[in-house]
Amino acid sequence: MKRIITYIFTIIISFSVCSCTQYSNDFDLKKDTFNINKVSFDKLNQYLLEQFSNIENSELNFTFSVSEETGEIEKLYSSYSHEYIYLDEDITELFTNVKNSFTYDFSIVSITSTRISYGGEGNEMFVYSLDGKKPKYFWADNKDAAFSIYSLDNNWYYLFLKQR
């Protein structure tokens, strides 16, 4: 009986260690990908703040419009002004670079007084904290979804659902 309990305990510990290692490896890969595209993230932050920080609204959300011909992001749709914002080639390239950091969908940018969030279908997000504080919520359909937060760099965080 002791052998069976020891065997079961060993299996449980093994699965736990493997699971933690997988998350660590996933995060290391995500951090490397972020670092490759960090300049694009930072330039987009600067662009977004210059263009939209003067708007009096608690949250600005933008979704992408993708060209049917090229498959590239060509404009943003503003849910605040209900209009399309056409992007020049340099900004389009920055969005394309940022998109390469995502394993899942990247289709939304959200700006609040405390953060700029890059995300999509609610599986993962890159968040820049404007107030220097760790993000406290994950932008997803299920507001109670369990998520993890990893610090990437000064004020940059990677958030992802624990069960995807």
Stretch-by-stretch model annotation:
Residues E74-R164:
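Extracytoplasmic electrostatic interaction patches
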Residues S14-V17:
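Bacterial Sec-type N-terminal signal peptides, specifically the leucine/valine-rich hydrophobic h-region
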Residues T6-I11:
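Sec-dependent N-terminal signal peptides
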Residues M1-I4:
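Positively charged n-region of N-terminal signal peptides that target proteins for export
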Residues S19-F95:
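N-terminal export/targeting and maturation segments
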